[in-house]
């Protein structure tokens, strides 16, 4: 049971429910193939049925960790830090990103955009979900839009979301892993017919790395 005092610090963003942190190769989207240090923050109520990290949903199962400790670990490994979840924007990201930027680190976020954007970000990957749509200014600020394709209806959703981002935003369609054999040919066909889109694959799963 987390005390009220600790929970206050979490709500302020001074501590965060840390699920895991690891140094690996970015497997998805624009920066795939590059080394980065990942910080996975617990807590998410978006509830995607195909989520591959459902253990991240309940923030109370992950230890509240000071952002100073998180930053000190991150700086040992990489100049590029990716904050993911869970849904990191559940929490105030300003204290963490201020700490990372003070050490001259590049800050990237992977988010559904379901909560207002906080933090100082060099790269924003917006991956919107139907059951809890993005809010606020994140559409204008996203550098890449990554839509997960589980069935043919997701192509319609992808176009609806693409209409809301800036012209400079890079557009990706990514197969949901469990249906990849069926859905990849559909994505390939769609991208060939609509070349503003690119294909994103979870290459880290093919490489068998985190």
Model-derived features with residue positions:
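Conserved AdoMet/S-adenosylmethionine-binding subsite of the radical SAM
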Residues: 71, 89-210
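A short beta-strand-turn-helix
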Residues: 26-29
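Radical SAM enzyme core and accessory elements
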Residues: 1-13
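A generic structural micro-feature
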Residues: 31-33, 139
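Conserved Radical SAM active-site core
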Residues: 3, 16-23, 35-38, 42-121
């Amino acid at each position: 049971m987390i005390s009220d005092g600790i929970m206050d610090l979490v709500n302020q963003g001074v501590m965060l429910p840390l699920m895991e942190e690891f140094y690996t190769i970015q497997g998805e989207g624009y920066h795939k193939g590059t080394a980065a240090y990942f910080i996975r923050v617990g807590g998410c109520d978006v509830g995607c049925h195909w989520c591959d990290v459902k253990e991240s949903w309940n923030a109370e199962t992950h230890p509240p960790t000071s952002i100073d400790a998180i930053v000190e670990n991150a700086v040992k490994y990489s100049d590029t830090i990716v904050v993911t979840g869970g849904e990191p924007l559940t929490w105030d990201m300003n204290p963490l990103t201020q700490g990372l930027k003070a050490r001259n680190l590049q800050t990237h976020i992977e988010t559904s955009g379901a909560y207002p954007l906080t933090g100082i970000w060099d790269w924003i990957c917006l991956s919107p979900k139907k059951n809890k749509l993005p809010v606020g200014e994140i559409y204008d600020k996203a550098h890449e839009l990554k839509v997960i394709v589980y069935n043919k209806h997701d192509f319609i959703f992808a176009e609806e979301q693409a209409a809301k981002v800036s012209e400079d935003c890079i557009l990706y369609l990514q197969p949901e892993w469990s249906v990849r054999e069926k859905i990849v040919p559909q994505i390939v066909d769609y991208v060939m017919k609509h070349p503003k889109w690119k294909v994103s694959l979870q290459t880290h799963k093919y490489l068998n790395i985190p």
